[in-house]
Structures are given as structure tokens and as C-alpha cells.
Amino acid sequence: MASRPIVLRFEGRNGQFRLTVSPQELFPSLKQKILEHLPPDTEPSSINLSNKPIGTGGDERLLDTLDGIALGTVGLKHGDKLYLGYQEKQSLQDGSANGHITNVSSRRLNGAPVPQTETVSLRPQPTSPTAVIKNPWDVVQQSPLDDALDKKDGKIKRNRDMKMCKHGPKGMCDYCMPLEPYDPKYLAEKKIKHLSFHSYLRKLNAATNKAELKSSFMPPLSEPYYRVRRDCPSGHPSWPEGICTKCQPSAISLQPQEFRTVDHVEFSSPDLINSLLDFWRKSGAQRLGFLYGTYEEYTEVPLGVKAVVQAIYEPPQVDEIDGVTLHEWHNEKEVDEVARLCGLEKVGVIFTDLLDAGQGDGSVICKRHIDSYFLSSLEITFAARLQAQYPKATKWSRTGRFGSNFVTCVLSGDEEGAISVSAYQASVAAVEMVRADIVEPSAEPSVMLVQSEEDDSENKSRYIPEVFYRKINEYGVSAQQNAKPAFPVEYLLVTLTHGFPTESSPLFVEGNFPIENREVIGESQELRHVAKKLVSHGDPDKAIRAVSDFHLLCFLHSLSTFSKDEEALLGRVATKHDPADGVQLISTPGWATLVTILQESGERPPKRPWLSSADSPRAVPQAGKRFFPSRPESPKSESEQLAKRFKGASLE
């Protein structure tokens, strides 16, 4: 007896339809019936079927590969639903692999045609809010510092209150019991504006994972996601063809970030700042450099973290009176490798914003203050892009990352006309808003503009959610305001403290090798400078200090004379200052090659072995003054005369 016909339901991104079929029919026989319900330009060979929405992990099979298989043999029954995936012929011609329309058929919500293009190029690219890691506490590898801070209880110990405590010396009461690291009264008393990252983590964890509930552990951190989900399970066409409440981002309510991933920036020596300022002193143009250092525990705040800067590398750039234009940094990976061999990593960026006051006393104009701005909208966007490139790995986040430890420092004039350092970070919300192309810099530095979907100048496909922030209105009441078209940049900014160590002991004790990429002011790195640095005149202590220069190490790396093991040894000599390592270094083939290069270039190489195992290095000289003069004391040097001639030249 023939089987009774059944009705199968099909759902694709263009809608749903039904087909009446026989259980004995083969799958390929459905192709023509299915094509009747699909767009005319559908490629027949691209049709695939799945038991779940396409792209959500179902069992997807191409219809052509099911030849010889009957519908009844796979268990399909009356009323079952199958999900369709397919591609248009034009999409295949354009090289699309996901079937999304990439030509003018892609439209905004207002109907304006746009191509399907990536809006912002930032690495690494998060995929979606659902791209979580299973058991991140077992998989994600944190930094050793984060692991060490995780093991600390972070409690703030208090002494016995002689007035309020009635118990003995071994007792404890509410007046002397340890406080949590996020205690608001303690933070207000110590004038700590932002929680440290691990204090904030303890605060969230106390509310998310309560031990008394004995529930399964949930990571307390979750990165914001302000973009349209590309893996929406609703079955509608992908954005910008379609959108629903499941895939569109919610409205954004901006508020000052209560925590910071780095609490303090410490410069190991004032000479680091002075060397960067020297470029401005000689040219009058601004300068930018990347900070290399380490992250360490900062004991001034509970569970705090500080970035200790040991070196500043100045990448290729065009410097102007009012800003800097960065060129492509071809040897960035090589510089990062040299830093890694010295135990360092890229921790931030620093740039100058200085203008001589013209008083003749070295004072500069104060442009950044409470009535103007501290970090402009363009600079916040720049900081957010850099922070997006260097995410912070953490096992307390469902995606395995949260925020960034990358810092941004500015050298500018203070209210007294002196040159001072300021340290900042862009908030986590700011990084995601820049990544989602929701905001853009304004000509007014104190405000950030919200993008508009109707703006077709960039010809990009983006969804702009509603953005709100709270402010004190003219009646003294905190009221919610619509952030369009612009809002204050303070909502995207986190301030950090900065300073210098009480007893300076920099990792690199020499700093007179010419700094890279300064040819515009007549300074260049040449072999004669290497020969001059390495002449010890029999002084082993001086010879050890000679290679303890980050800029010299980067230049030697560019010569490719040392093997990887020899470069690692060179890094140890530069940072540890061990005479035994120095003796081993001058016995390597790479060192002999360097001597040969200096001889063939006509420069004078070291005349004798400059290290002895019996000798020990002298004490490292103390750090210089922490006062940054606006101009050098002696204007009679050759560099000063060159600077005077250069100052009138164009920097473009």
C-alpha cells in the first residue's frame, strides 16, 4: 500500500513555505519545488538542508549530496521543519562564501543602499557575544601577575581602635575587622577614584557567585557588544537586509567607569621623559613613542597594578607643530622581540602636546585643564584602537578577555606653565563604541560625535543604537540626556596616577646612543656610534653599561650579526649587568662578526676584551633630576645650532 503524503515545512532567510511530498521521494527530486519558492537568482547547486537554523551548529548537507536517499529513511514525519541555506549567483561571482548579498541589494533601515563591508579594521576581531569559551578558568592563560593577585584575599587590615574596641588584643569586632578591597568608605578616605581591576572583580564575584547558594560557577565579567549579531537564529536575512530584537544591540547608557585595569604608571628614570622632550626642544614639533616595560603589583591601592616603563621607542612618524602622523612601522615585530629578550613588553604610548609660552623662561602654555579637556576625542579614539589591539587575557570573562592594560600618557603644560605627565585609559565601553563605529572624533576636542545612519559619506553598513548619558541639568537634577549628536568625552575616559621611584634603578643604565627615526633633526644611528659605545679602555664596568641601552640593542638586531641564542645572551648582559655573561658574549661568533663589520666599515672596534670574570660592576649611578626644563641650559652645542636653523623650516 502506498504511503500517505506528508507536509514538510521549509524556512530560509527569505521566509517560510510548505511542500506536500511522499516519504518515498528522493531528496534531489525536491530541488525544483524548492527553487520555485526561492529568489530567481539562486544557485541550484548551493542549496543545503539542516535540522537547525543555518550557521548554528546543525547537521547541514548539500541537497545534491543526498542522491539516492528517500525522505522516509531519515525519519522525516508529517509537519517536520527543515532549514534552507543557499547562495545567489551574483554572490558566488563576487567571491562570497556565506551567501550574504554584497551589492546594492544590501540596504540600511532607511532604505539607502550600502555594500556589505567591514566598518572598522581592529585586531583582534571579536566574533559575537555568543563566542564564549567553555570553562575559561581552565583554558585561558593569564599573566603571572594576575595569577598572583587572584591568590591574595585583598583584605584591608585595620589596627585595633583604642576608643571603640572593647575586646582584648587577640579579639576582633566591627571596628577593627579587615575591610573588603572595594569598601567605598576606605576608597573615599584614601581619595582613590577608581577601583583596581582585581578589587572590581572581587566586588562582582561576591554578587555573582555566592558560596552559600552552592550554584555552578559563572564568570562575572562580560565585554560589551554594541554591534549587530551575525549569527542570529531567527532565520531572517542578515544585516543590513534584516534585523530583529534578538540580533540588534540594546541602547547604550554611558556612565563613568568605576574601575581601571592599570592604576599607576611608573617611569624608571626621568631621563626617559627628557630624551623624548629633547626632540621638541630642538625642533618645536611634537613627538610620539611607544612605552616598553613590565606590569607589577602596586601596593598603594588594594590589589593594584602598575606599569613600569623601562624604554621608549619612537616609530617612523611625521612630526608637526600641532600633531603627529604615524608611518607604517615595518620593524615593529623585531623591536617587540628585542623587548621580549629583555623581559619587557609594550605597555603603552606617550606623546607630547607642547607650545612654548614665549616668555623666555622655559614655560609652556596650559591647554589641558578642567575647563577645556584632558584627552581630546581624537586621542581617545586613538587610545581605544591601541587598547583593542592589546586585549587583557583573563579567566574571569566568558570570552577569555576583558579590557586592556595598555596606557596612554601625555606630556603637556600644567596650570603653572611647567611640563607634566598625565596618564589615561579609554574605558571598556569606549573601545567597543570605536570598534562598532558608533562614535567619531569631533573638531571640538572636549566632545565626541555619535555617528548617523543617514550619513552616506563613508558608505558603510552599520547599526547605530540609541546612546544616553546622565548629567546635572540647569535645575540641579541628574537627568538622562540623548547623546546625539555629541556628548562629553569624560564618559569614555579613565584617569591613572603616575610618578617616579623613590630610588631610581633603571633596567638600562646607558642612554646616549642616538635614538631611532630622528634624521629630520640631524640625528641618525650609524656604525661609528656603535664603535664609540663599545670602546671600554680597559674599564669592565663601563663596558657592561655600554650595551645596556635599548636603542643600541634594537640597532644591533637590525644588523643580523647575532643568532637567537646570542641575542638572548646580549639581552641578559644589557639587563643583568653580569660580568660572567659579558665574557661569554665577546667569545661568540656574532660578536666576532660585529667586530669585522666595524673594521671593514673603517670604524674603530674594541681593542681588547672588555670583561673579566674577576671584575664586578660598579654601582649604578642615581637617577637624574625630575625637573623637565623646557630648553637646554647650554645653547652653544652643535645640536642647538642645528635646531635653530631647523626651527624655521617646514615640517610637512
Curated annotation (Swiss-Prot):
Q: What is its main location?
A: cytoplasm
Concerning Pfam families, the annotation shows: NPL4, zf-NPL4
Domain of life, per UniProt, equals Eukaryota
Note down the stretches annotated as region Disordered. 94-132, 602-652
Matching entries from InterPro entries are given as: MPN, Npl4, NPL4_C, NPL4_Zn-bd_put, Ubiquitin-like_domsf
GO cellular component annotations, sorted alphabetically?
Answer: endoplasmic reticulum membrane; nuclear membrane; perinuclear region of cytoplasm
Q: Specify the protein's topology with respect to the membrane.
A: Peripheral membrane protein
MF term (GO), any = ubiquitin binding
| Protein name as annotated | Nuclear protein localization protein 4
Q: Which organism is it from?
A: Aspergillus oryzae (strain ATCC 42149 / RIB 40)
